[in-house]
Amino acid sequence: MGKKKKGCLRRIGCIAIVVLTPVACIAAWVFLSWPDVSALARENPQTTAFIEAAKTNGDRVEWSWVPYDRISIEVKKAVVAAEDMSFFSHNGFDTHELKIVARDAVKGKKVRGASTITQQLAKNLWLSPSRSPLRKVREALLTWQVEQSLSKQRILELYLNVAQFGPETYGVGEAAGRYFGVPAGVLSADQAAQLAAGLTRPSSWHPGVSSRGYSAAVARIQDRVSRCDWLDKLL
C-alpha cells in the first residue's frame, strides 16, 4: 500500500475517532443515567426532578402519597378533562393536539401546550425545565417507555401524586388537606375542578385565589366534566 493511501486512511481514522468519541460518550451518559421505568409498576418514587429542583432553589416542599383507590373519582375526571382528554386512547402522544399546535404556529397564533399526562409525568419525574433538543429526545423516549411499562391507571396515580397543585404543594393528597381540610378520597366535583384548574400555573392559580382567569378555567373544566360520563367506566 502506498504512503499516500496509508496517509489517507490515517486521516479517515482520526476523523472517525473525533466524530464517534463524543457520540459514544453521550450514549454512555444516557445509558448510565437512564431511570428504571418498569420499577414504577411496583414501587412509588421517593422524589422527583421537579421536587429536587424546588429544594435546590430553597423552596419548601410539602408532599404526601395517596393510593389510586383512595383518590376521589371526581379528581381523576377533572384532571383528565383539564389536561388530556385523549389520555385513555393515545400511546403517550396526542397527534391531534400536535397538529393543532403546528397549524397555530404556522399561522402565528398563540401556541397552546400539547403535552399529554404521560409526557408531563416523565418531565416531573426525571427531567429539568430545559428545552434543549437532547432533553426533548429524552422526554419522548421516556414517555414511550412509561406507556409500554405501566397501565393507564398507574400513570394517572403517579401523575396525581407528583404534580404541583400550588406553592410548596405536591400531590393531590397534600392539596386536599391544605386547601379543603379533607382527604383526597372525599373531594367534591367543585373542589376537584379547582385543583385541576391550577395545574398549568401552580404558583399563582390554586383554591382561594381571586383571579378571573383562574375562575374561567375552573368553569371550563366543570363544563367538560359534565360532558364526559364515559370517563366513569375507565377510571
Predicted regions and their residues:
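Juxtamembrane regions of bacterial inner-membrane/periplasmic proteins
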Residues: 2-235
